[in-house]
Regions:
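Nudix hydrolase/Nudix homology domain
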Residues: 93-137
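Active-site-adjacent beta-strand/loop module that shapes the phosphate/pyrophosphate-binding cleft
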Residues: 11, 59, 68-91, 99-101, ...
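A generic structural micro-feature
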Residues: 1, 30, 74-79, 94
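Short secondary-structure junctions
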Residues: 55-62
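Conserved N-terminal beta-strand and adjoining loop/helix that marks the start
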Residues: 1-16, 37
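Conserved Nudix-box catalytic region and its N-terminal flanking loop in Nudix hydrolases
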Residues: 15-54
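Hydrophobic packing within well-folded, soluble alpha/beta domains
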Residues: 44, 48-52, 65, 83, ...
Length: 137
C-alpha cells in the first residue's frame, strides 16, 4: 500500500485550494488536494509540509485532520491521509500541476476528481455542513 498525505488548504475567507494534475502525470488533468508519497524516514505531517513546498512553493501549518481514505486503483492501492491546513507563507508557483483554484466548499463536487480524493471531498463537505448547522439560528 502506498501512503500519501494531502492538504486541504483553507484560506482566510474559507476557500479551499485544489490543484489539477498535469497532462504528463498519472491520472492526467484530474483535480486533487496537493500532497505526495510519504518517505520511509518521515511522518505524514513532515511529508505534507515538504511536498507542498516542493510542488507549490508555499509554507503551510497543519490545523486538523480527516479520516484516511483507502482506494484501489487498477495498478496500486493508495492510503490517502488528509490534513486541514492554512497557508503561512510564500506565493503559489506551480511546479508539477497544470492549474490551481481557490473554491468555495459548495463548488468542490463540480470538479473531475482523482478517485482517491473523492472520499476526502465527501468527508470534508459533511464536516462543513455539520459546522454550519451547529452555528445556525
Amino acid at each position: 500500500m502506498i501512503q500519501v498525505s494531502c492538504a486541504i488548504i483553507v484560506n482566510s475567507i474559507g476557500k479551499v485550494l485544489v490543484t489539477q494534475r498535469s497532462a504528463l502525470m498519472p491520472l492526467p488533468l484530474k483535480w486533487e488536494f496537493p500532497g505526495g508519497k510519504i518517505e520511509d524516514n518521515e511522518t505524514a505531517e513532515e511529508c505534507l509540509i515538504r511536498e507542498i513546498k516542493e510542488e507549490l512553493n508555499i509554507e503551510i501549518e497543519i490545523t486538523g485532520s480527516l479520516s484516511p481514505n483507502d482506494h484501489q486503483y487498477p495498478d496500486k492501492l493508495i492510503r490517502l491521509i488528509p490534513f486541514i491546513c492554512r497557508q503561512t507563507g510564500g506565493e503559489i508557483v506551480l511546479k508539477e500541476h497544470a492549474d490551481y483554484k481557490w473554491l468555495d466548499v459548495r463548488d468542490l463536487l463540480d470538479l473531475d476528481w482523482a478517485e482517491a480524493d473523492v472520499g476526502v471531498v465527501e468527508e470534508y463537505l459533511k464536516m462543513n455542513v455539520k459546522s454550519s448547522e451547529s452555528g445556525g439560528t
